[in-house]
Amino acid sequence: MAKPTGFLEYARETPRRRPVEERVHDWLEVYEEFPRERLNKQAARCMDCGIPFCHSGCPVGNVIPDWNDLVYRDRWREAIERLHATNNFPEFTGRLCPAPCEAACVLGINNDPVTIKQVEYEIIEHAWAAGWVKPQPPKVRTGKSVAVVGSGPAGLACAQQLARAGHSVTVFERADRIGGLLRYGIPDFKMEKHVLDRRLQQMEAEGVVFRPGVNVGHDITGDELRAKFDAICLAGGATKPRDLDVPGRDLRGVYFAMEYLTPQNRRNAGDELPYDPFLDAKGKRVIILGGGDTGADCLGTAHRQGAREVYQYELLPKPPLSRTEAMPWPTYPMIYRVSSAHEEGGERDYCILTKRLSGENGVLKKLHAVRLEWVNEGGRQVMREIPGTEFEQEVDLLLLAMGFLGPEPGGVLDQLGVELDARGNVKSDANKMTSVPGVFTAGDMTRGQSLIVWAIAEGRQAARGIDRYLMGDTVLPNTC
């Protein structure tokens, strides 16, 4: 332990966000650079806690105290080696992960936790700048081939692990570019896409073959995949959005979040798309249904498009400001948080149920809603409408960001005959193999809507299962 008293000497400090009046006029990442000397002090706050519960909070099992100590000692090259041993893509998690590791930090019991996420971000960015992140092609090829369906974080993690183990890996993606949700679902102000592209270049140099623009199940069937490859990993994500079943849903001006975010990401990438006035928030009254990260992504995008006003409505009650007895340490607390998008403007309101939508000439004009109360009935929280609280809100653009229900049914899932669970997710065993021998699955397609860090962990675990299936044993690491 480099600085046993660091947590007593230094307060928690994180990077500042760029001024709101500046950043809402561009699509660049929102955080300012963090001075190296201040980061060393933040790493020094990692205490000699004996049992590092941050491990339990990290799905990929990052050895966090080790690389905190190495950063404090300025041993950056060793730090990135330790970090890459458990996490293929720390540049993604360092930007996009909600950091459940910090929620489990022992220091966080009675103090502010260590800035684990920021240290992770600085390690990987320093490594890229120093030229330490290089392709790691295998020394020996196995002669086995694997098809990975889906190029989100789960599919990419699985592909990289398998390629490094010596297998020939082909990643299929139905979109025109590789990256899945990272490419078209995450706004640039959270992660600029050159961050993704440089990692894909590394993977190509390691032998991974990318095939964008191929819709597996349509352009190539499940049977064709099985005939051409020795194993398959299904990592297509949970892409079926939760819909709003109310009168007026079919009015122009109502869109799923991904229908709204994807075109803007494509324009930021330089694509020339036909202009759709209904999908442009400029000068519009916007309502977002859903209070999660996707809703915040829509909020930040609407700000940058020049929305007149934005409301974000949530069905659930407003979260508490700090942990309650129902959220004991080291669990991840569901508390009230202010994202960069919320800092930029807009109104959040809670306990609101949409009853219907109305419009003129087929175009959305108003949202009609009622306020709710949540009551305990036999140990269950049940919502009740509050009489007399009905209201209507003028709206030009309504965005549905209410989560995802699971993978899209039919298609390659039916063609391969994999078994689904009660929620419609692909069932798998401990090795991530489905009910069909040689067909594996990873990420949101099997666990349901979740975090990027869980997708990476799932992809690594699936790669381990596939390697064992193909070779009889595996040297790939187990994911915690």
Language-model features, listed with the residues they occupy:
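Feature captures the FAD/FMN-dependent oxidoreductase FAD-binding
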Residues: V140, S145-V149, D197-V246, K355-E377, ...
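Glycine-rich dinucleotide-binding loop and its adjacent helix/turn
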Residues: I123-V140, R198-H218, P241-Q305, L420-S435
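A conserved FAD-binding loop/helix module that cradles the flavin
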Residues: G295-G300, Q305, M445-L476
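Short Fe-S-cluster ligation motifs
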Residues: P4-V20, E29, A43, M47, ...
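Local cysteine-cluster metal-coordination motifs and their immediate loop/turn environment
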Residues: A44-D66, F89-N110
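Conserved hydrophobic helix-helix packing surfaces used for dimerization/oligomerization
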Residues: V146-V148, V169, V286, V439
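Beta1-alpha1 glycine-rich phosphate/pyrophosphate-binding loop at the start
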Residues: T5-E32, G61-R73, E78-L83, N87, ...
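FAD-site-proximal beta/loop scaffold in flavoenzymes
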Residues: D250-G283, V363, V375-Q449
